[in-house]
């Protein structure tokens, strides 16, 4: 086993030295969110510088190139590319997991005072290569532990940064790239969509990790203790996002935690592919503007006008804007000055702004005029009970005013309203009102009108019946009296015919009447057939003879 390790170390010495480079990127900040992002790797513009790596034991490593879309939180932990010598044996292995995370975080410093870098990627099905170099204090004063490990998404990330696309490549045999898409977890923040960023490429000691394209939530500078400038390979990408992308100003690269000086590497400004999903504050660097950040309030400029109606000191009268005379307006010509005089002042402000101010003088209509207008609208106007409001408007170029509106508000006491409603209780019942109470008083009693109609009908019927009875009695009494008279006359005539009479006066009168009729015919021939004979024409002699003859 030891011989195999020694042979592997010898082979590593013969291989080209690897170099590890990564773009300096801004500190983690708010992560932009995009609904849909498509990325594709582009060929590197320049080869990455190589560095020699010496190991005392051989290492075997089989790697599979992969392309992942995953959030990655990276922080600087070492100087950019430098040579690393490892005297301890190292072993490389390839593992495949269903879900992994790529995270760059700072590890504790080793005994030599050199911090180590830990890079972790996240993808669903992903192949990762691991190479661990053991520390040998005798061989190197500043050994480092560099590993590329695959594991589930780490939860140590405390901030978010613009997503970037990194390309990790090593010389040697390569395999077809594997593309994986992951769902990022932002530790309680809103879940953003993947976006593009710059590509970073670095080779490893043994084998070749194909182009690894990752889309993460953080960025940092990965370097080795004895720095060499890293090569930045831009990536051609096309992103389709929803919403308006917010530009991000370039932010300074994160400082290296290594005590050795590190060479600066070019860091282009990252352009987010979409608005950020959460408004998380970033205290270490500037990131893209979050879509949930409140915009600063700005003063809105525009034409401003005052209310068309300005109330004057008298609450009963208000003045409106001037009116032009028309046939539909009620105009009052005043001998005094108009109660409402408006002065329009136009002032230019800003870009063609116009402000209109309205003023009214102290010349108000007298109380008598207002009272007359209110009494005209309501004859029973009572100033102690009613409130009247008159809206006037001046006429242009004259002292006349326009009466636009007269409003009267009547304040009635509950007792007055109750008395008015008592007279309309029947109408209220028809509308569904069942009861009405004011203190101890209630609705009008129903007994008052309960028997009124039947009583009236009864009285009318009795009066008609009495009239009918009186008419019948009068008719019957008249017929009875007429029968009695007829019967009496009949009896008298019968007695006269039989020669027996009880009333001699009647007989004398009858004989005298007969005689008078004859005499009238004989004596007064000029009268003709007249039955009216004056008594003066009769003589006593005739009467005596008549009496004697009758006896």
UniProtKB/Swiss-Prot annotation:
Task of the protein: Involved in the regulation of both adhesion and cell morphology and cancer progression. Functions as an anti-adhesive molecule that maintains an open filtration pathway between neighboring foot processes in the podocyte by charge repulsion. Acts as a pro-adhesive molecule, enhancing the adherence of cells to immobilized ligands, increasing the rate of migration and cell-cell contacts in an integrin-dependent manner. Induces the formation of apical actin-dependent microvilli.
Report how it sits in the membrane: Single-pass type I membrane protein
List compositional bias (Polar residues) regions by residue number: 60-90, 142-164, 234-244
Keyword annotations for this protein, in alphabetical order, are: Cell adhesion, Cell membrane, Cell projection, Glycoprotein, Membrane, Phosphoprotein, Signal, Transmembrane, Transmembrane helix
Naturally occurring in which organism (per UniProt)? Oryctolagus cuniculus
Give the comment on domains. Answer: Both the O-glycan-rich domain of the extracellular domain and the C-terminus PDZ-binding motif (DTHL) in the cytoplasmic tail harbor an apical sorting signal. The cytoplasmic domain is necessary for the apical membrane targeting and renal tubulogenesis. The large highly anionic extracellular domain allows to maintain open filtration pathways between neighboring podocyte foot processes. The cytoplasmic C-terminus PDZ-binding motif (DTHL) is essential for interaction with NHERF1 and for targeting NHERF1 to the apical cell membrane. The extracellular domain is necessary for microvillus formation.
**Record region (Disordered):** 18-324
Q: Into which family does the record put it? A: Belongs to the podocalyxin family.
Name the UniProt record assigns to this protein = Podocalyxin
Q: Which residues lie on this side of the membrane: Extracellular?
A: 22-452
Q: Give the signal peptide, or none.
A: 1-21
Q: Which residues carry this modification: Phosphothreonine?
A: 511, 549
The chain residues annotated with the modification Phosphoserine are 530
Tissue specificity, per the record, is: Glomerular epithelium cell (podocyte) and endothelial cells.
Q: Which InterPro entries match?
A: CD34/Podocalyxin, PODXL
Pfam assignment, any one: CD34_antigen
Q: Where is the composition biased (Low complexity)?
A: 32-59, 91-104, 289-300
* Localization terms from the record: Apical cell membrane; Cell projection, Microvillus; Membrane raft; Cell projection, Lamellipodium
What residue ranges lie in the Cytoplasmic compartment? 474-551
What is one cellular component GO term in this UniProt entry?
cytoplasm
């Amino acid at each position: 086993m030891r011989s195999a390790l020694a042979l592997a170390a010898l082979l590593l010495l013969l291989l080209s030295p690897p170099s590890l480079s990564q773009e300096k990127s801004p500190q983690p900040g708010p992560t932009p969110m995009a609904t849909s992002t498509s990325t594709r790797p582009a060929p590197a513009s320049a080869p990455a510088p190589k560095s020699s790596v010496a190991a005392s034991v051989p290492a075997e490593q089989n790697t599979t190139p992969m392309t992942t879309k995953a959030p990655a939180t990276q922080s600087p932990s070492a100087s950019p590319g430098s040579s690393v010598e490892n005297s301890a044996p190292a072993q490389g292995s390839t593992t495949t997991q269903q879900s992994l995370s790529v995270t760059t975080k700072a590890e504790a410093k080793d005994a030599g005072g050199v911090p180590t870098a830990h890079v972790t990627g996240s993808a669903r099905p992903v192949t990762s290569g691991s190479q661990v170099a053991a520390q040998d204090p005798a061989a190197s004063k500043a050994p480092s532990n560099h590993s590329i490990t695959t594991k589930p998404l780490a939860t140590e990330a405390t901030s978010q940064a613009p997503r970037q696309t990194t390309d990790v490549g090593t010389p040697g045999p390569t395999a077809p790239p594997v593309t994986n898409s992951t769902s990022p977890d932002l530790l309680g923040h809103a879940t953003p969509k993947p976006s593009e960023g710059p590509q970073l490429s670095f080779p490893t000691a043994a084998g070749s990790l194909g182009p690894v394209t990752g889309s993460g939530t953080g960025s940092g500078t990965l370097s080795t203790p004895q720095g060499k400038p890293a090569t930045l390979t831009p990536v051609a990408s096309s992103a389709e996002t929803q919403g308006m992308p917010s530009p991000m100003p370039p932010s300074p690269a994160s400082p290296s935690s290594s005590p050795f000086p590190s060479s600066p590497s070019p860091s282009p400004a990252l352009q987010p592919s979409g608005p950020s999903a959460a408004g998380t504050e970033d205290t270490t660097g500037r990131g893209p503007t979050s879509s949930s950040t409140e915009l600063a309030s700005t003063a809105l400029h525009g034409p401003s006008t005052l209310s068309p109606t300005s109330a004057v000191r008298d609450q009963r009268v208000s003045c409106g804007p001037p009116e032009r005379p028309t046939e539909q307006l009620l105009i009052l010509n005043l001998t005094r000055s108009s109660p409402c005089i408006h002065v329009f002042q136009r002032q230019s402000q800003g870009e063609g702004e116009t402000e209109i101010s309205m003023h009214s003088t102290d010349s108000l209509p007298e109380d008598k005029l207002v009272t007359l207008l209110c009494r005209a609208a309501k004859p029973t106007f009572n100033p102690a009970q009613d409130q009247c409001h008159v809206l006037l408007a001046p006429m242009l170029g004259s002292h006349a005013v326009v009466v636009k509106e007269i409003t009267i508000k009547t304040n009635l006491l509950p007792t007055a309203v109750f008395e008015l409603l008592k007279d309309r209780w029947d109408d209220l019942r028809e509308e569904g009102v069942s009861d009405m109470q004011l203190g101890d008083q209630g609705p009008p009693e129903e007994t008052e009108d309960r028997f009124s109609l039947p009583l009236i009908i009864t009285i009318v019927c009795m009066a008609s019946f009495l009239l009918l009875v009186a008419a019948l009695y009068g008719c019957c009494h008249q017929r009875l009296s007429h029968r009695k008279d007829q019967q009496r006359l009949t009896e008298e005539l019968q007695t006269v015919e039989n020669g027996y009479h009880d009333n001699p006066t009647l007989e004398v009168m009858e004989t005298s009447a007969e005689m008078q009729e004859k005499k009238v015919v004989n004596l007064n021939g000029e009268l003709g057939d007249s039955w009216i004979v004056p008594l003066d024409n009769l003589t006593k002699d005739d009467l005596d003879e008549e009496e004697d003859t009758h006896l």
